[in-house]
From Swiss-Prot:
Function: Probably functions as a manganese efflux pump.
Intracellular or extracellular location(s): Cell membrane
GO cellular component, one term: plasma membrane
InterPro entries: Mntp/YtaF (IPR003810), Put_MntP (IPR022929)
Membrane topology term: Multi-pass membrane protein
Annotated protein name in UniProt: Putative manganese efflux pump MntP
Cystine pairs: none
Annotated family: Belongs to the MntP (TC 9.B.29) family.
Transmembrane feature ranges: 6-26, 37-57, 71-91, 101-121, 131-151, 162-182
Name of one Pfam family that matches: Mntp
Length: 182
């Protein structure tokens, strides 16, 4: 993999991780032990490996079966997902969040990683390198979740919704780039 191929994946990993970062900011404002913070971040990272992997496998299958139609659908999926993230971030009401424990942690991690499934689907259609991609997504999401949790412990409402909006805009940009390569 060349440096030029790695840069878009790194940017996309940060875009996907912004959702985990934003939610972790709010969660970090609760009383959490360091061990809980580490465990939450690792769980989010693992889900950001599993979900895009499943998406990439499915995306490769669709690409082999449907070719150009699958490429177009992958780009549209990224654009739609990006707009959805921006839209839902703007309309989201500030609700009280509780620290996820046990099964609720898995549900939480699944929720913040569901967008990585869609991105994985698109990347699978385009034939991205699986191992590098999913490890990068997992590591960056884990790191951003930890950063969000630690910042949330010390500050209130620094980025919140704005972090999700930036992530959504980046996904729209990548979708447009796939539709109209420069």
């Amino acid at each position: 993999m060349t440096f030029e191929q790695l840069i878009p994946l790194i940017i996309m990993a940060f875009a996907l991780g912004m959702d985990a970062f934003s939610v972790s900011l709010g969660m970090g404002m609760m009383t959490l032990k360091i061990r809980q913070i580490l465990y939450i971040g690792v769980t989010i990272g693992i889900f950001h490996i599993i979900m895009p992997f499943i998406g990439m496998v499915l995306g490769r299958f669709l690409s082999e079966q449907y070719g150009d139609i699958a490429h177009f659908a992958g780009a549209i999926l990224l654009i739609g997902l990006g707009f959805y993230i921006v839209y839902s971030s703007i309309l989201e009401n500030e609700e009280t969040r509780t620290a996820p424990i046990g099964i609720s942690l898995f549900v939480f991690a699944f929720g913040v990683s569901i967008d990585s499934f869609s991105v994985g689907l698109s990347l699978g259609i385009y034939g991205a390198q699986t191992i590098i991609t999913i490890l990068l997504f997992g590591f960056v999401s884990m790191l951003l979740a930890w950063i969000g949790l630690f910042i949330g412990r010390h500050a209130k409402d620094m980025l919140g919704t704005y972090g999700e909006i930036v992530g959504g805009i980046i996904l729209v940009g990548f979708g447009l780039y796939l539709l109209f390569p420069i």
